[in-house]
Amino acid sequence: MAPARARLSPALWVVTAAAAATCVSAGRGEVNLLDTSTIHGDWGWLTYPAHGWDSINEVDESFRPIHTYQVCNVMSPNQNNWLRTNWVPRDGARRVYAEIKFTLRDCNSIPGVLGTCKETFNLHYLESDRDLGASTQESQFLKIDTIAADESFTGADLGVRRLKLNTEVRGVGPLSKRGFYLAFQDIGACLAILSLRIYYKKCPAMVRNLAAFSEAVTGADSSSLVEVRGQCVRHSEERDTPKMYCSAEGEWLVPIGKCVCSAGYEERRDACMACELGFYKSAPGDQLCARCPPHSHSATPAAQTCRCDLSYYRAALDPPSAACTRPPSAPVNLISSVNGTSVTLEWAPPLDPGGRSDITYNAVCRRCPWALSHCEACGSGTRFVPQQTSLAQASLLVANLLAHMNYSFWIEAVNGVSNLSPEPRSAAVVNITTNQAAPSQVVVIRQERAGQTSVSLLWQEPEQPNGIILEYEIKYYEKDKEMQSYSTLKAVTTRATVSGLKPGTRYVFQVRARTSAGCGRFSQAMEVETGKPRPRYDTRTIVWICLTLITGLVVLLLLLICKKRHCGYSKAFQDSDEEKMHYQNGQAPPPVFLPLNHPPGKFPETQFSAEPHTYEEPGRAGRSFTREIEASRIHIEKIIGSGESGEVCYGRLQVPGQRDVPVAIKALKAGYTERQRQDFLSEAAIMGQFDHPNIIRLEGVVTRGRLAMIVTEYMENGSLDAFLRTHDGQFTIVQLVGMLRGVGAGMRYLSDLGYIHRDLAARNVLVDGRLVCKVSDFGLSRALEDDPEAAYTTAGGKIPIRWTAPEAIAFRTFSSASDVWSFGVVMWEVLAYGERPYWNMTNQDVISSVEEGYRLPAPMGCPRALHQLMLDCWHKDRAQRPRFAHVVSVLDALVHSPESLRATATVSRCPPPAFARSCFDLRAGGSGNGDLTVGDWLDSIRMGRYRDHFAAGGYSSLGMVLRMNAQDVRALGITLMGHQKKILGSIQTMRAQLSSTQGPRRHL
């Protein structure tokens, strides 16, 4: 017999707890599979063994029936009492939740059950595809969890009828079979199951971004997301496939894609509604319906376009948003001016343009031999200048008319919708009568004789003299100089001799006839070259030749004497081994080319100018050295730079049969001057002569369009100085030397061609995606536009002082050696990661310091070999500077011998007075301390903001500062790389100053 069970009265168990256990309807997104609170009477669950769980039916204080399952076998050990639910279909759910409401007795409140009473129970489940009835076994169930009560009641609670209800929820899954059972296992607790609700979660149906999403059951586990594809609502279409994800909590997450209302519909309250009358929408999208344009209407709802009103039309290329227009009225104020057998017609635009601006004009010519009521077409012999139809201007010349004939001219105004109108076109009409005709053109003209100073011509009478020819007029001029001057000669016969011409000169001759009706047209041009002059030397000529020779000998003798006496340089004259390129009239001199066959190691005695300024028209130079590109092949995408006279854009060049090529487009701004256009085309002509991997490549030019454009290859990383500043400290020394080697190779190529750049700086070097550096900017304009401080203005023009050799500043004379000086400054810029040369010194301070012998110190971490090469480039005597071929060979050697780059340069002397604020004379104090403080030193190098950092780090004297290294500076919290370099560079300078204890200070 089973041991006696400690059982509580059902009334004491459930009466008070009943109110708390009443049914709560499923929350939003929850679907109940089982809810015992809605079951009246016995739940019909299976219990095992028989003396375990008891089914209790009671009523609460309101006399409502209450059903529970209770167990309280706390006196006996090893309890194993099972309570199983009926079979529950899962209804497609992959994960369900069990909400259990129960009460549990505190074991401490029951005497004598210390070893047998428990305060927990187990929850199990079993899946099956059908109802198994009572044939389930314990071993078939899978445990879900062990459940303990948050609150348990005691005997005192029973006395006051206050029981403590517990609610626990457990997830069950993943489920795959058609249904399942839940089972409660009692192991010795005193508890009562008041209700059980089994449910699953789902995401509710909704409309989002005009896409309808149906209900979706959540996933099999708590972290899964179920993808659901939406369907566009009525009258909408997909822009991007609409999708959302249903979370395990029954919430919609991560909306992707959307639908948009179709043409003729607009979005209103998650639906697409038809456009009202008088409104339209021409394309699918988010936009709302728009009101019909002027002179149009929509006859039905959901209109995609608006129909034009009567007598109004819309051209084929007009967008649906354009107003409907109509043909223009007739031109007004038509006047004619008859000149013999030609007439000039002029008129004013129509008073009513029809709402359009694309007005052109057509001319209709009718010949009326007898009366204006009997007219016929003028025929193909009539000539219209510039044309008969599609005239843009309001004037026309009609020639080759018959003499003494009546004509009627109709001038029509048409626009883009004139062809759509069935109505006759409006026209202005004028009737005229021609006068006597002028003679026709002289067709045949030939040379009869040509001497040194005269030419005899012979020609035939015009085929249509149209009267008595009174005289002939001969027009002649030197070839290509007609616009400068020409002369005329009259003749009464068909033969004439023109005298007073220059010997050995090519002349152009034209002839025309004149009658009482006027002059005919000039004949076709005929070229004749006069005879070459015979050499004659009279006494006067011989005397002049002798005087010239004697004068030359005297001048040569004086030059030799001056040379022996060591005549010095003057600002007006320079050595004859280099051409002097002076600025004149405030304009920059043209680029200079050396002969192509001169030895690379020497400068020729004479430099030849082979650039666009030698052409009378820069456009001819451009055609000689550049390729014309059709403007339609260029697609501009964005502006990447701007200057005073132009803009630089990024775009793509369409190449037939190939992919589009990314290019940079330099375009002149509207309103440019002729001088700016000439300089612009000259720069293109210069670039077109170069072909080198380290010179920016010219793709072509556009000169025939509205805007002049230069098209070059696109360099992704922009200018070298800005690129280095952006990537401060990110490259190895070998990489930096490789960049310099590319710039040097490009300059060697230019030098070998005899080209002097004159504006070499890091800002004028471009970098592509493979870190290849290419020399650019051959117009000497960028620095002067972008940074006025970078140019020093003299009476002769502007010079980029910080990059220019001293002799070029002093005498305005440029050479390949001055380009070498500039290359040395570029080397310093690269090793200093784009820092400004000479920092904040004024231009005048730079000039004075360089003249005194100061040279830029080595940047932080600069190899000694590279700084020595810089100093060689900055030699005061330009003849001692290396050639670019030597510079490239040195850089090649350094790249192939990285170990030579390990020794870093040191600053051994103090900078000039212009740098006094950043260089202390520490030797005066002996120990290096003197009266100077750390704060004074920081202020002098403009780093006073870090006073507190040094004080907090314990650096109270300059002696302690001198022992700092890069790690110490970073440890103070100074994170900016540029500020670290500036502080460490100043410390290095002070150390070097202390080490130099012998002799006076000298400049580098």
Curated annotation (Swiss-Prot):
Matches recorded under Gene3D superfamilies: ephrin a2 ectodomain, Galactose-binding domain-like, Immunoglobulins, Phosphorylase Kinase, domain 1, Transcription Factor, Ets-1, Transferase(Phosphotransferase) domain 1, Tumor Necrosis Factor Receptor, subunit A, domain 2
SUPFAM superfamilies, sorted: Fibronectin type III, Galactose-binding domain-like, Protein kinase-like (PK-like), SAM/Pointed domain
SMART domains: EPH_lbd, Ephrin_rec_like, FN3, SAM, TyrKc
Segments traversing the membrane: 542-562
Boundaries of every SAM domain copy: 929-993
Residue stretches making up the Protein kinase domain: 634-895
Annotated signal peptide: 1-26
Record-annotated active site: D759 (proton acceptor)
Region (Mediates interaction with PIK3CG and required for endocytosis): 588-643
Fibronectin type-III domain span: 327-437, 438-533
Modified residues (Phosphotyrosine): Y615, Y838
The keyword Nucleotidyltransferase is annotated on this UniProt entry: no
InterPro entries hit by this protein: Eph_TM, EphA8_rcpt_lig-bd, Ephrin_rcpt_lig-bd_dom, Ephrin_rcpt_TKs, FN3_dom, FN3_sf, Galactose-bd-like_sf, Ig-like_fold
Glycoprotein as UniProt keyword: yes
Alphabetized UniProt keyword annotations: ATP-binding, Cell adhesion, Cell membrane, Cell projection, Developmental protein, Endosome, Glycoprotein, Kinase, Membrane, Neurogenesis, Nucleotide-binding, Phosphoprotein, Receptor, Repeat, Signal, Transferase, Transmembrane, Transmembrane helix, Tyrosine-protein kinase, Ubl conjugation
Modification after translation, per record: Phosphorylated. Phosphorylation is stimulated upon binding of its ligands including EFNA2, EFNA3 and EFNA5. Autophosphorylation on Tyr-615 is critical for association with FYN. Autophosphorylation on Tyr-838 modulates tyrosine kinase activity.
Subunit structure: Heterotetramer upon binding of the ligand. The heterotetramer is composed of an ephrin dimer and a receptor dimer. Oligomerization is probably required to induce biological responses. May also form heterodimers with other ephrin receptors. Interacts with FYN; possible downstream effector of EPHA8 in regulation of cell adhesion. Interacts with PIK3CG; regulates integrin-mediated cell adhesion to substrate. Interacts with TIAM1; regulates clathrin-mediated endocytosis of EPHA8. Interacts with ANKS1A and ANKS1B; EPHA8 kinase activity-independent but stimulated by EPHA8 ubiquitination.
Function: Receptor tyrosine kinase which binds promiscuously GPI-anchored ephrin-A family ligands residing on adjacent cells, leading to contact-dependent bidirectional signaling into neighboring cells. The signaling pathway downstream of the receptor is referred to as forward signaling while the signaling pathway downstream of the ephrin ligand is referred to as reverse signaling. The GPI-anchored ephrin-A EFNA2, EFNA3, and EFNA5 are able to activate EPHA8 through phosphorylation. With EFNA5 may regulate integrin-mediated cell adhesion and migration on fibronectin substrate but also neurite outgrowth.
Name of the protein described by the UniProt record: Ephrin type-A receptor 8
Organism field: Mus musculus (Mouse)
Originating gene: Epha8
